[in-house]
């Protein structure tokens, strides 16, 4: 069901802040373990002022932090779960027993993602492909909706939405936890 002004409105929301504390430096094995633990961690119960959003369809990823955030915003409703809006997975850039800083592991892993390194579980091409697939689905369904997704993935999703003709309320280099971006077509 579309809103009253006949424009398709999609609210892209970054999940709430995760209740997890990363080590400042770690070995490759420790980093990989922390990435797994982060993906299983709940969101913090903070007083985040989420925007008031009314829509029929709410998409969440398969990661619990997405669903928990959706419950905080929309209450107990039926959510449409999709792997297409899952965060871009991350792992260590190489194996080492030497402890390296967290910023190094994050940067090196995302650089490998960018060049489609087989070391990373998913490369940039794969991420763009699933974002494009999800945007195509949104355009076919043509219903106002909310998407509770993840920070790194949001950049790719919003880029694909622009390519599909959506107008983006505001772009950012970094999307804050709980931030909603309004996309309309």
Label each PLM-derived region with a short phrase.
Residues 28, 96-100, 163:
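Residues in and immediately flanking transmembrane alpha helices
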Residues 2-84, 101-132, 176-179, 184:
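Active-site-proximal alpha-helix that buttresses catalytic centers in soluble enzyme cores
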Residues 2-8, 20, 24, 132-185:
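Active-site-adjacent alpha-helix immediately C-terminal to a catalytic or transition-state-stabilizing loop
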Residues 84-99:
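Signature for phosphate-centric chemistry
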Residues 63, 85-87, 161-166:
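Proteins with a high burden of low-complexity, intrinsically disordered sequence enriched in S/T/G/P/A and R
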Residues 26-29, 71, 83, 92, ...:
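A generic "cationic amphipathic patch" detector
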